[in-house]
Each structure stands twice: as structure tokens, then as C-alpha cells.
Amino acid sequence: MGLAAPRKKTKISHDPNNTSWSRSTDGFGHRILKAQGWTPGGFLGARNATHSDLFTTASASHIRVVLKDDTLGLGARPKRNLLDGPTGLDAFKGLLGRLNGKSDTQLEAEQQKRDDAKLARYAATKWQTVRFISGGLLVQEKDNATASPASQDLRVDFPRETSSHESENGMFKMEPMDSDSQEGGCATAKEEEGKKKEKKKKNKKGKELDMSSRKSREKKQEKRQKKRKISDCDGLDAETANRTSTNVLVAVANDKGTCLLASNGPATSRERQPMGRRIFRSRHIEQKKRALMDDKSLNEVFIILSH
């Protein structure tokens, strides 16, 4: 560029890698953790935790913040080509190990670890893997029998005292009762008998009341049925009286124009009693029948026809 190029002044700071904050012990977080019992190089959480076996040196190091600039999910790793990595490092590490005086068994163990890591990386890139962190093991609680053996030793089997009513063989004995106890028993028996008699009387009275109420209801129902029957009979008599009339046979002579009227005996045919809305229609039909059966009206009609 020469002398005509723009000049840029760059100043190298005292902490180019920005690691002074991690080494400082004057921060608030460092001081509060120390106050809570944490020591530098220790792990956070309970010391006797169930997952304490899984702690490594990374658990005591600082938290690394990684910028997420892709649309992958949390914890996802992009696929990497295994051929992009450096080749020949395994052989070079083995050569360095031999120069340092390591035995063949140690070299084989290290090589086996490297091969296992390669296989794990290949499987992780080819198939999705899920990493599980154990939260502890289920441990059976101690039973009361094993927890407190001393309490069982303290238990003493006391002999059960036989009552006066129970004999040595387990049979009950009948003791002679005193006169006072006999009188008390008689009084209680009499009271019980009196209560039973009162209950029986109450039950009898209740039954008699029920029977009387039933009889009164039955009588009322019978009276109502009788009234209905009487009213039905009256209506039927009136209808039959109106309906029973002489059957007229009308014969019209075509030549003379005279009519012959003949009457027969009373009709004994029974008709069904109309119900509901058909009552009015039946009345109208009966009026028409009466008009046809009337002698005078028929004669007038036939005279008009003859003229």
C-alpha cells in the first residue's frame, strides 16, 4: 500500500482473551457462593447426590455460551463429514507413546478408546441419539422389622388372666346370681315385655286405621260407579225411545202416483253409542231419519212428485 495507505492505530489490551473476569475473586457471584459453602474447584449442589458419580472436570469449569445461528432444535448437532477431520493422528499419537516409553497394553487401551469414540461419533451422525442422565437409583426402604429390632426385644408376652366366668379349659362357668341381681333381671324382663305389648298395640291400631281408610275409599268408588251407571242408563233409554220407531216401507206406483205406507213392529236392533265428537253428527242423522219416517212429510213429498 505504501505511505499513502490510511493509518490505523491498534492497541493491545492487557486481557486480549477476556479471561480476567473468570480469574477474579472479587465478583458478587464468587463471594456469595463462598458464603454458601462453595470452594473453588468444587461442584454445585449436594455433595452426597445420587448423580455425583457422573460429575467430571467439565462440571467444575465455567459455563460456555454458544451463539445459536441456525433453526435446529436445542441440543441438535449438525451433521459433520468424518473425512473432513485430520488423518493420521492416531498413528502419530501411538508413535509418540512408544517414544515416551509406554507399554503395548497402554497403547492398545488408548487405541481402543479412540476407536470407540469414532464409532460413537459415526452412530450419532447417522442415527438420532438420546442422552439420558440418571436421576438416582430406587432403593427399598428398610422394613420396621429390620429398622427397630430392639423394639421387638422389648416386647414381652404377658400371660392372659383367666376371668372368673372362664374355666381353665376355656369353658364358661355359670355363677350363682344374688337376689338383688335376680330382681333387677326380672324388672328388665318385665319392661321389655311391656314395650313389646305397646308396639303390638300400635301396629294393630295402624292396621285398623289402614283397613278403615281402604273401606271408605272402596265405598266412595262404588258410589261413583253406581252414579255413572245410572246416568248412562238414562241416556240410553232416551236414545232408544227416540230411535225406536216404525220402519216404513215406501212403494211408489209409477202409473197411479199413489203411495202405500206399511208399518212394522218396533225395531230391536242395537246400535253403538257414539262417543266424543260423533254425538252431534249422530243427532243430525237422527233428525233426518225422523223426517223420513214421518207420514205427513212423506205424503207431501210424494204428492209433489206425482204432480
UniProtKB/Swiss-Prot annotation:
Alphabetical keyword list: Nucleus, Ribosome biogenesis, rRNA processing
Any one Gene Ontology BP term: rRNA processing
InterPro entries in the record: G_patch_dom (IPR000467), PINX1 (IPR050656)
KW Hydrolase (keyword) present: no
Ranges of compositional bias, category Polar residues: 15-25
Renumbered residue ranges of the record's region Disordered: 1-25, 144-234
Chain's role: Involved in rRNA-processing at A0, A1 and A2 sites and negatively regulates telomerase.
Protein name: Protein pxr1
Lineage: Eukaryota, Fungi, Dikarya, Ascomycota, Pezizomycotina
Gene: pxr1
